[in-house]
From Swiss-Prot:
One of the GO biological process terms: cytoplasmic translational termination
Gene field: frr
InterPro entries xref list: Ribosome_recyc_fac, Ribosome_recyc_fac_dom, RRF_sf
Protein name: Ribosome-recycling factor
Location in or out of the cell: Cytoplasm
Major subcellular location class: cytoplasm
Keywords: Cytoplasm, Protein biosynthesis
Database matches in HAMAP family: RRF
Role played: Responsible for the release of ribosomes from messenger RNA at the termination of protein biosynthesis. May increase the efficiency of translation by recycling ribosomes from one round of translation to another.
Family statement: Belongs to the RRF family.
Family matches, as Pfam families: RRF
GO cellular component, one term: cytosol
Any GO MF annotation of the entry: ribosomal large subunit binding
């Protein structure tokens, strides 16, 4: 593995950490309705647990209401039960073959919990990025030790990896700050 390969791999993995953070933050509840909020819910479908999106159509009715329309009418009760039993604190209402999921307004305490959860997700991503930096630096040190690269190359690579790390951590901070602002908006 060359220094260029190490940098390319590290950049790619750091980008994956950012994408994972975006997905995790999308699941953190804000005051507004968002169909991705229900992505983590699984429904019993003929004996196997499948994601809600595979048994129903999930859309927004308005800013505070999600509509869930199961493709099979027989699934309505199971879908409603799965949403109610999730840890999201939602109370779905069935209207025949359509299930309405109103978003209750969040209390100040719940907003603070969600903000803390968003910060924890951000911190986990920062740790992942820093671990990738450490792994890259160790790989370069091994190349120098094996005499496949010079110490000057090592210093340049470590500086480049540090710049990548700083850039990704700044992006993580921005994502978390935007999510916190979204959560705390009344």
């Amino acid at each position: 593995m060359t220094i260029a390969d190490i940098k390319k791999t590290t950049e790619s993995k750091m980008g994956q950490s950012i994408e994972a953070l975006k997905n995790n933050l999308a699941r953190v509840r804000t005051g507004r309705a968002n169909p991705s909020l229900l992505d983590s819910i699984h429904v019993d479908y003929y004996g196997s647990m499948v994601p809600l999106s595979q048994v129903a159509n999930v859309n927004l009715l308005d800013a505070r209401t999600i509509s869930v329309q199961p493709w099979e009418k027989s699934m309505s009760a199971k879908v409603e039960k799965a949403i109610r039993e999730s840890d999201l604190g939602l109370n779905p209402a069935s209207l025949g073959d359509l299930i309405r999921v109103p978003m209750p307004p969040m209390s100040e305490e719940r907003r603070k919990e969600m903000t803390k959860l968003a910060r924890n997700e951000g911190e986990a991503s920062k740790i992942a990025v820093r671990n990738l930096r450490r792994d890259a630096n160790e790989a370069v040190k091994k190349l120098v030790k094996d005499k496949e690269a010079s110490e000057d190359d090592q210093k340049r690579c470590e500086a480049d990896v540090q710049k990548m790390t700083d850039k990704h951590i700044t992006e993580i901070d921005a994502l978390v700050a935007a999510k916190e602002q979204d959560i705390m908006a009344v």
